[in-house]
Amino acid sequence: MTDFPLTTPVALLIFNRPDTTARVFEAIRQAKPPKLLVVADGPRPDRADDIEKCKAARAVIEGVDWDCEVLTNYSDINLGCKNRVSSGLNWVFDTVEEAIILEDDCVSAPTFFRFCEELLEYYRHDQRIAVISGNNFQFGKKRTDYSYYFSRYNHCWGWATWRRAWQYYDGEMKHWPQVRDGDWLTAILEETQAVKYWTKIFQATYDNKNDSWAYRWTFSCWIQNGLTILPNHNLVSNIGFGEGATHTATKNSRLANISRQEMIFPLKHPPFILRDVSLDKFTHNSVFKAKSFSLQQLSYRVRWEVSGFREQGTRNREQ
């Protein structure tokens, strides 16, 4: 990656896991962004060990040894997933026009940064594109001859976006009743099972029965008809499954530690901007499979299903 001069700011979202934070930071260190914006949640009041863990995670950032402007937005108290991530990204996009975003357990391939930077520039003024993601959940199957494809699913384990897109984030989901009652999800999703699945999730989110910022971001993108760019092969691995995780405790999850590949340049751009319906159907069936589950199960699934920031604290607040 040293032969590519990264110019895009990088935002890093951290909490209380210095071990995984250090691995993510090392990937960022190799990329050498000129600006690093760090968002950190505070310790949970009922977890005394959080104080030292949060300090240790923040200390990792002191390892910046390249020419870099480091900006920090650290909370002294625990805001929870929804409020910390959304307020942190509000700060990020008040500060910069566009950014590459990583959370504290998402390790990227070196070419992930160039992939994001080139596409941030390429689609900068194209309102149809809301998110550039480094995730590919096709599980090793090559689906297109191009470098990437367009999807409705804005996977967020390593992603990038612009201020122009993030401005539509609505943490209150104020348009949900109108979308629900007008059956607009059918127009968006087209398939009955997908509509049932996401109606249940969005209703629970609207009712504040989970603490997910990611579901709210997905809803915000969908009602703006925003597309996500997904690479033809996976560029980011989530290393946060297993011991120490709150909602990714299952080490054998199909989504845990998916292998990374390097992107080949120059990028081969698709000649049209159309959502790949068949690939989205595969993702729905293999990752977001519609089935009945309780709200307690929903709170455990939040962390990995939309690929969002660590839902640490949600389970403890519910107990």
Spell out what each predicted region is.
Residues 2-101, 106-305:
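An acidic/histidine-cluster motif and surrounding catalytic segment
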Residues 1, 305-319:
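Short, basic, low-complexity termini and linkers enriched in Ser/Thr/Gly/Pro
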